[in-house]
A protein has these predicted regions:
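Short, glycine-/small-residue-rich phosphate/pyrophosphate-handling segment
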Residues: 112-157
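N-terminal beta1-alpha1-beta2 submodule of the flavodoxin-like/Rossmannoid cofactor-binding fold
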Residues: 1-113
Length: 159
């Protein structure tokens, strides 16, 4: 029996196009298992407005629309989520953090099954560091690892 084909969603989070991190991710994607599909989304092309946390008010989160919907569907539609995240000031780029902030809303969007649907998907990271001290990337890697753990996602690590 063969396993179902893997579906990789690559979320490009750099503030510049065609940077070193994206180049590394595209090179790595050439070696994905045969039959795997790839979807590449660039947050430059899918800007999100500032996230508003309304959890403790009377308002409720609504179904995503526009760019948020595109990202929501891609996030839930993949088997493997790859965050292509250049190291900015020892952590994630602002656009990557904003994308993850939206997950707080998606956890509460009816029917409220985002956590269950994310469980079992593998979260990966691709990053490039210019510093000789690899510890500079620890906050970035930690953010991804803890995010995966919170949603019961296997963490594939960071290339």
């Amino acid at each position: 029996m063969t396993s179902p084909a893997r579906r990789f969603a690559f979320i490009l989070t750099s503030a510049r196009r065609d940077g070193n991190t994206e180049t590394l991710a595209r090179k790595a994607a050439e070696h994905l298992p045969p039959g795997s599909s790839q979807e590449w989304l660039n947050l430059i092309d899918l800007p999100l407005p500032p996230f508003e946390d309304i959890r403790h008010g009377s308002a409720h989160y609504t179904q995503p629309t526009g760019n948020e919907r595109v990202l929501f569907d891609a996030t839930l539609g993949c088997t493997d989520l790859v965050l292509v995240v250049p190291l900015y000031w020892y952590s994630l780029p602002a656009s990557a953090k904003l994308y993850l902030d939206y997950w707080s809303a998606w956890l509460r969007v009816p029917p409220g099954d985002f956590r269950q649907r994310m469980a079992g998907k593998t979260l990966w990271g691709v990053s490039v560091i210019s510093d000789k001290d690899q510890r500079c990337a620890d906050p970035l890697v930690g953010t991804l690892a803890i995010t995966a753990d919170y949603l019961k996602m296997p963490f594939g690590g960071v290339l």
